[in-house]
UniProtKB/Swiss-Prot annotation:
GO terms for biological process: cellular response to insulin stimulus; insulin receptor signaling pathway; intracellular glucose homeostasis; phosphatidylinositol 3-kinase/protein kinase B signal transduction; positive regulation of protein import into nucleus; positive regulation of transcription by RNA polymerase II; protein transport; regulation of autophagy. This is Phosphatidylinositol 3-kinase regulatory subunit beta. Keywords: GTPase activation, Phosphoprotein, Protein transport, Repeat, SH2 domain, SH3 domain, Stress response, Transport, Ubl conjugation. It comes from Bos taurus. GO terms for molecular function: 1-phosphatidylinositol-3-kinase regulator activity. The record marks 144 as: Arginine finger.
Length: 724
């Protein structure tokens, strides 16, 4: 067996010593076995990766620094390691213990494997879902990097009483209590290769079959939660790095084994100790980039009046799938997510299946605030969600479940198909009939939106401040507890010694020394009482402030629907004005946006002279976010580029706003290019760029107070003017 001098293994289960030469194991222990020891056992080259087939193995437990034998059925292979170890001592044959997979986990050590905790269509283990839901109800708090305390009770019966810190510790403790890391060593090695080669997103490397299905589902659920945590932070960048540092070691538990090149020789690119943190940081960045679409969906619109279908009893033909308002044909999953965003449970639509197989469709249903994808099967002219297929058409299938609960098909989906997303939506819901009247009403709604936004921002600042103060008070209470413990120990020692000295001075008749000892004892008791009183007062303040903090969070949550609704209404009016030909300068006045000084391009007499007509001045092809930010570094506001997005079939616009680079997705739909419905109206990227050369992006995102003014490769605009 040539190659490395030894190999590392990680314990999956606890093992108690049966013989003096045995090693005791705890889950997560790293064990080192020398190559010479495996050669002495007759292990063939390559079989060291399958410790369960080796049997008893001699090695070193790096946690306890003890040597001994351990069962190969209790460990998993990590990778090669360089070492210089003495050879094995001879030992006789010995039967292996049974692999402890089927029995209940030892309290406080391990949980069942993920496949034993949940199964699709559930998206994650119930314990983790319960903890995450409790955290997001309590208020998204920062995860602390400290390791969690060992938990022996996972019933979570009192989870509603936990504060944010205890809940976040619960999530971390859950990940540590799993019998195997959420990201398996094999998947971590694939992710490391993708991260090292920088050939594209790392996320696909952590999908089945590389990562087991239940692990992949749980990882996706956790990343969605952490994405919301990072998105809630005032500065997402530092929050992503902090979450990576906290959760990287929990998800991988150890760096992955190095992945050798095809030739088999090491290439010097072994994972660094900070790889777990970098991997989680990269996954969160990719998740946030997928969510970087700024504009929310418009509210549901009433369907156009259509003649009612003629009943079969009257000799008419059955309703066609193409005529069904809820059937959208060949649209992407991203478009479906956009149409169902912020809709109530029971909202649904049907599209062609992504498999493109004739007769197969996908029903997307809103349930529990998430989109549930249900496949519609087809065989021999019949349709259904599962065998037996009993419906003669998709229309019959959907009509049935508009009146009957989907719990007949899946107990988790206890809802009917209540609210179809209609493709026959009117384009506007604006009651005014003149541009000036609509503009005046737009100004009112925009002002209301800004007022609510300011109120929300003030509440968020107050919530952040009080959360920090609460953490300081908790730390102070812990300090009080330690101080009380020290003083009480001192009091016990003093009381023990005082009895001896009091008896001695009483015999000697030394009243003065007796009074001094008694006075010191009273002072110490008084001081302990003062500290107890201070701690009690601080605990009362903590409870009161925690209650106020929860009230602030409730007020913030109550403002969110108002903000979303006001923004949707405002967007309706913006679309109406744009389609009626209102000038952007006038729209900016209604929105209270100051029209900036004319730049060199707006002074051009002929719009045909704009550099925007040359795609090479702004289209840069396939580059990533970091490369785009480097190209735009130091450029003036309004400098932009268009690149391919990490989302398949989409593009991304990167633009400088207030000296910082912002990114937003450009969708390509059946109606054209655009940043969101109903703005996907442009026949080409060039048409979109020319429109937003004079139209502000603020109508899509309040933070994008800029136009696409300066193509990044166009001559002329340089760096921003130096500060005076």
């Amino acid at each position: 067996m040539a190659g490395p001098e030894g190999f590392q293994y990680r314990a999956l289960y606890p093992f108690r010593r049966e013989r003096p030469e045995d090693l005791e194991l705890l889950p997560g222990d790293v064990l080192v076995v020398s190559r010479a020891a495996l050669q002495a056992l007759g292990v063939a080259e390559g079989n060291e990766r399958c410790p369960q087939s080796v049997g008893w193995m001699p090695g070193l437990n790096e946690r306890t620094r003890q040597r001994g034998d351990f069962p190969g059925t209790y460990v998993e292979f990590l990778g090669p390691v360089a070492l210089a170890r003495p050879g094995p001592r001879p030992r006789g044959p010995r039967p292996l213990p049974a692999r402890p997979r089927d029995g209940p986990p030892e309290p406080g050590l391990t949980l069942p494997d993920l496949p034993e905790q949940f199964s699709p269509p559930d998206v994650a283990p119930p314990i983790l879902v319960k903890l995450v839901e409790a955290i997001e109800r309590t208020g998204l708090d920062s995860y602390r990097p400290e390791p969690p305390a060992v938990r022996t009770d996972w019933s979570l019966s009192d989870v509603e009483q936990w504060d944010a810190a205890a809940l976040s510790d619960g999530v971390k403790g859950f990940l540590l209590a799993l019998p195997a890391p959420l990201v398996t060593p094999e998947a971590a090695a694939e992710a490391h290769r993708a991260l090292r080669e920088a050939a594209g997103p790392v996320g696909p490397a952590l999908e089945p079959p590389t990562l087991p299905l239940h692990h992949a589902l749980t990882l996706r659920f956790l990343l969605q939660h952490l994405g919301r945590v990072a998105g809630r932070a005032p500065a997402p960048g530092p929050a992503v790095r902090a979450l990576g540092a906290t959760f990287g070691p929990l998800l991988l538990r150890a760096p992955p084994p190095p992945s050798p090149p095809p030739g088999g020789a090491p290439d010097g690119t072994e994972p660094t100790p900070d790889f777990p943190a970098l991997l989680v940081e990269k996954l969160l960045q990719e998740h946030l980039e997928e969510q970087e679409v700024a504009p929310p969906a418009l509210p549901p619109k009433p369907p156009k009046t259509k003649p009612a279908p003629t009943g079969l009893a009257n000799g008419g033909s059955p309703p066609s799938l193409q005529d069904a308002e809820w059937y959208w044909g060949d649209i992407s999953r991203e478009e479906v997510n956009e149409k169902l965003r912020d809709t109530p449970d029971g909202t649904f639509l049907v599209r062609d299946a992504s498999s493109k197989i004739q007769g197969e469709y996908t029903l997307t249903l809103r349930k529990g605030g998430n989109n549930k994808l249900i496949k519609v099967f087809h065989r021999d002219g019949h349709y259904g969600f599962s065998e037996p297929l009993t419906f003669c058409s998709v229309v019959d299938l959907i009509t049935h479940y508009r009146h009957e609960s989907l719990a007949q098909y899946n107990a988790k989906l206890d809802t009917r198909l209540l609210y179809p997303v209609s493709k026959y939506q009117q384009d506007q819901i604006v009651k005014e009939d003149s541009v000036e009247a609509v503009g005046a009403q737009l100004k009112v709604y925009h002002q209301q939106y800004q007022d609510k936004s300011r109120e929300y921002d003030q509440l968020y600042e107050e919530y952040t401040r009080t959360s920090q103060e609460l953490q300081m008070k908790r730390t102070a209470i812990e300090a009080f507890n330690e101080t009380i413990k020290i003083f009480e120990e001192q009091g016990q020692t003093q009381e023990k010694c005082s009895k001896e000295y009091l008896e001695r001075f009483r015999r000697e008749g030394n009243e003065k020394e007796m009074q001094r000892i008694l006075l010191n004892s009273e002072r110490l008791k008084s001081r302990i009482a003062e500290i107890h009183e201070s701690r009690t007062k601080l605990e009362q303040e903590l409870r009161a402030q925690a209650s106020d903090n929860r009230e602030i969070d409730k007020r913030m949550n109550s403002l969110k629907p108002d903000l979303m609704q006001l923004r949707k209404i405002r967007d309706q009016y913006l679309v109406w004005l744009t389609q009626k030909g209102a000038r952007q300068k006038k729209i900016n006045e209604w929105l209270g946006i100051k029209n900036e000084t004319e730049d060199q391009y707006s002074l051009m007499e002929d719009e045909d002279d704009l550099p925007h007509h040359e795609e090479r001045t702004w289209y840069v092809g396939k580059i990533n976010r970091t490369q785009a930010e480097e190209m735009l570094s130091g450029k003036r506001d309004g400098t932009f580029l268009i690149r391919e997005s990490s989302q398949r079939g989409c593009y991304a616009c990167s633009v400088v706003v207030d000296g910082d680079t912002k990114h937003c997705v450009i969708y390509r739909t059946a109606t054209g290019f655009g940043f969101a419905e109903p703005y996907n109206l442009y026949g080409s990227l060039k048409e979109l760029v020319l429109h937003y050369q004079h139209a502000s992006l603020v109508q899509h995102n309040d933070a994008l107070t800029v136009t696409l003014a300066h193509p990044v490769r166009a001559p002329g605009p340089g760096p921003p003017p130096a500060a005076r």
